[in-house]
Amino acid sequence: MKKTNNIKKETMFQAQNIFLTYSQCDLSKEEIKTFIINLCNEKKLQINYLIIGIENHQDHKGKHHHVFFQLNKQFRTRDLTIFNIPKNIKEKKLIDHENIKIKDFFYSPHIEPRPGNPIKDTTDVRNYVKKDGDFIEEGTFKHVRYIKLSKNEKPTELESLTNNYFLKLRKEYQQKEINISKTKNEIFKKLKLYAESLEPNYAFKNAKRFKNMVFEYIFESDIKELPIFDFCTFKKIPILISIYDILETQKEQLSNSISKRFKTLIVEGNSKSGKTQFFKSVLTNLELPFNYIKDDVDFSDENYDEDKCVNIYDDIDIYDIQARNLTKVVIGNQKDSIVNMKYKPRTKIKGTDISIMLVNEDTSIEKYCFDNFKRGRKEYKYIRENAIFINLDKHTITHYEYQKYENEQAVIQHFEMPKNWDGLLYFLDQENES
């Protein structure tokens, strides 16, 4: 019996994204859809996405039906005739006769992927099926890009793609006003994810090279730093005045060489509420040089200066701090601590440094302490005794945004009433601090 598929029967076909073309096919899209669904059900496979489109050829070659579907796991078979659709279901039994040709009674598709002809980009396939506008689709489409390399082939195409993407990211971030450390970390993560979408093994093997690319070829001159707003642009509401007074008192103690370990200011509030700009403005106004550490506890030379007396930790998860055993370094400022950074010289964190933590609602340390207390743990006690909690809630604190609140007294009253979590956390007022 003659077979129309070129792949030998003993060759294992296995694919999660499958593209079929039924040439000169008179079946409807719904009939093909039913066939594909039943076939996958027999294989106990779930269809995540399915699209069927009709292409009308003007050269009298009839209609082509293009079928593309994505599965929850690989479709495996050694017999590709399984994709043949009977022209008339009653005539299926005639396949057993030796003199019967498959093409006379079955629509036999061209199948991809196949040796030497992989599906390189699922988006391209999807667009091809849609090109004539006569299609049906259902499910959730997933973009996947494949680049097949032989064992001895150098990944020049992958390198070219990742290098170009890196340059694109670098150019994009040059247009933004953003912190240099955050920029490097974000670009590295995006570059790694992009490489994984191309070829997971390639991404895994080249992760170190990607990191070197980012940290060696992005310089501070490439990135625009956020401008620091003048202190007068912030409203003189009670909670902000109290923060200013606390920092001013701590500055006086530093100036008088008073050996005192400061409690950490933990400031929680909604994202984009102006927390970062306020503290940068206050510290600049007080002439207190500061380190700004964002997203990751990075005490490397590029991100941390031991001579600066204030450390701002912005949007760093308390669980990450604990995992690195840095809780008593970041919060409460123990005696001088030595921090070991991987592949970096050891860094000294002075016990007399002023420590400020800026936290968004999704990484609330206040909520962490409450949950820790309910579970009968004791970690919350150290944080409670070595931190001043200030909650800015959802109200913006910059002058430019403040005008949208019509009732200024209501806003001021709100800021004077921080959350307390049933007495678990206490707030140190100005008198106790001094």
Curated annotation (Swiss-Prot):
A motif (RCR-3) lies at residues 128-131. Residues 12-141 form the CRESS-DNA virus Rep endonuclease domain. GO terms for biological process: DNA replication. GO terms for molecular function: ATP binding; DNA binding; endonuclease activity; metal ion binding; nucleotidyltransferase activity. A divalent metal cation binds at E55, H64, H66, D132. The active site is at Y128. Keywords: ATP-binding, Covalent protein-DNA linkage, DNA replication, DNA-binding, Endonuclease, Hydrolase, Metal-binding, Nuclease, Nucleotide-binding, Nucleotidyltransferase, Plasmid, Transferase. Its cofactor is Mg(2+); Mn(2+). A motif (RCR-2) lies at residues 64-66. SUPFAM superfamilies: Origin of replication-binding domain, RBD-like, P-loop containing nucleoside triphosphate hydrolases. It holds the Pfam family Gemini_AL1. ATP binds at G269, N270, S271, K272, S273, G274, K275, T276. Its EC number is 3.1.21.-. It is an enzyme of class 3 (hydrolase). The keyword Acetylation does not apply. InterPro entries: CRESS_DNA_REP, P-loop_NTPase. There are 3 rolling circle replication (RCR) motifs. RCR-2 may be involved in metal coordination. RCR-3 is required for phosphodiester bond cleavage for initiation of RCR. Belongs to the geminiviridae Rep protein family. This is Geminivirus-like replication protein. The gene is rep.
